[in-house]
Amino acid sequence: MQGFFWKTWLVVALCGTSSSLAHRPLSYGEALELALSIYNSKAGEESLFRLLEAVPQPEWDPLSEGSQQLNFTIKETVCQVEEERPLEECGFQEDGVVLECTGYYFFGETPPVVVLTCVPVGGVEEEEEDEEEQKAEVEKDEEKEDEEKDRPKRVKRFKKFFKKLKNSVKKRVKKFFRKPRVIGVTFPF
């Protein structure tokens, strides 16, 4: 009976040790491919995204047991997710969404963990355009108000209130959809 206990204990110890052994080396190119594959499968987008640009990481260590960071830019393609076509066959959309992504690989975890954060490019320019549109809209509204001087003050106040409410809702909706997407997954080696 004691022999059986020790044999079982030895098998359990070996299994536990083998899972904590070093991970398979992951080159920078493989890490980019894996990150892109994870984004396309987990982000919930309708279109596939393809690598537009990768920032070289000279300090990338494929044998590292710590964390590794990579930065890259992806762009929306004409291919849909459900088509399951190779990315090389998918051209970029003319006005496709461009995302700047940062990926963190945590190799010290068992199993290793990847966390991706992607944010749309051009957020500042879009905000400036939105402000210009709002200013133009306010000017038009002021012109209309001058024409509508015969209306009661109550109607004017309600109109002004609902205009502010509309602009506020528009702004919040745009902000909501600009939030970065964060994806975290574990992957086996």
Swiss-Prot record:
Disulfide bonds: C79-C90, C101-C118
Positions annotated as propeptide: 23-155
UniProt entry keywords in alphabetical sequence: Antibiotic, Antimicrobial, Cleavage on pair of basic residues, Disulfide bond, Membrane, Pharmaceutical, Secreted, Signal, Target cell membrane, Target membrane
GO biological process, one term: defense response to bacterium
Coiled-coil segments: none
Residues annotated as signal peptide: 1-22
Additional note from the record: The putative mature sequence has been predicted by AMPA, a predictive algorithm for identification of peptide stretches with antimicrobial properties.
Protein name: Batroxicidin
UniProt source species: Bothrops atrox (Barba amarilla)
